[in-house]
């Protein structure tokens, strides 16, 4: 007698839709050079209990649908026994805490990584006076400041997730950096998360260029 296959606790059709959305956007980010050597991870809220996320160790420029898996909001695989990114908890803590967050993107561009090293000592990069600050949801003027927090890198994701958790309610955040690592950015959907990610990339690049121009020769 054949065992009855248990129904999936999520919509397979919705997963297929999100996999295509993720793969297309991730491929563009890979082509920009922001996901070197299989690095980076990406996710999208699937429903109120699950997220679609990239499988660990896959070339982000060559993803196929099987490279997108499902995890619950505790970071545990659901449906297929695949290994999610080591940093899955940094995604799921955002979905669990903020129901409005629909997409989380994590990249490793040179600009993001260099900025994270340069500002690790202060733990923050202040961005102010830029017109592009209005790219962040809720900002309506350049006459404001956005503090991008820089967290120390660690292989203990429980520790890092707890550090992030402690600061999520203390200021407006659209993303943060991890020292020597890269950038996390999020939004209500893929389009908004991409906008925030690209705004951070541009503004961090401007800050690095200003540092060079101000340095004595």
Swiss-Prot record:
Family matches, as InterPro entries = Aldolase_II/adducin_N, Aldolase_II/adducin_N_sf, MethylthioRu-1-P_deHdtase_MtnB
Q: Which Pfam families match?
A: Aldolase_II (PF00596)
Q: Entry cofactor note text?
A: Binds 1 zinc ion per subunit.
Listed GO CC annotations: cytoplasm
Renumbered to this chain, the signal peptide range is none
Kindly state which keywords UniProt assigns to this record, in alphabetical order: Amino-acid biosynthesis, Lyase, Metal-binding, Methionine biosynthesis, Zinc
Q: Which domain of life does the UniProt lineage start with? A: Bacteria
Name the cofactor(s).
Zn(2+)
Q: In which pathway does it act?
A: Amino-acid biosynthesis; L-methionine biosynthesis via salvage pathway; L-methionine from S-methyl-5-thio-alpha-D-ribose 1-phosphate: step 2/6
SUPFAM superfamilies linked: AraD/HMP-PK domain-like
Catalyzed reaction equations: 5-(methylsulfanyl)-D-ribulose 1-phosphate = 5-methylsulfanyl-2,3-dioxopentyl phosphate + H2O
What's an example GO BP annotation here?
L-methionine salvage from methylthioadenosine
A GO MF label: methylthioribulose 1-phosphate dehydratase activity
Q: Which residues does the annotation say bind Zn(2+)?
A: 106, 108
* Enzyme Commission number(s): 4.2.1.109
**GTP-binding as UniProt keyword:** no
Family stated for the protein in its record? Belongs to the aldolase class II family. MtnB subfamily.
- What does the UniProt record say this protein does? Catalyzes the dehydration of methylthioribulose-1-phosphate (MTRu-1-P) into 2,3-diketo-5-methylthiopentyl-1-phosphate (DK-MTP-1-P).
Q: What is this protein called?
A: Methylthioribulose-1-phosphate dehydratase
The organism encoding this protein is Xanthomonas campestris pv. campestris (strain B100)
Lineage runs: Bacteria, Pseudomonadati, Pseudomonadota, Gammaproteobacteria, Lysobacterales
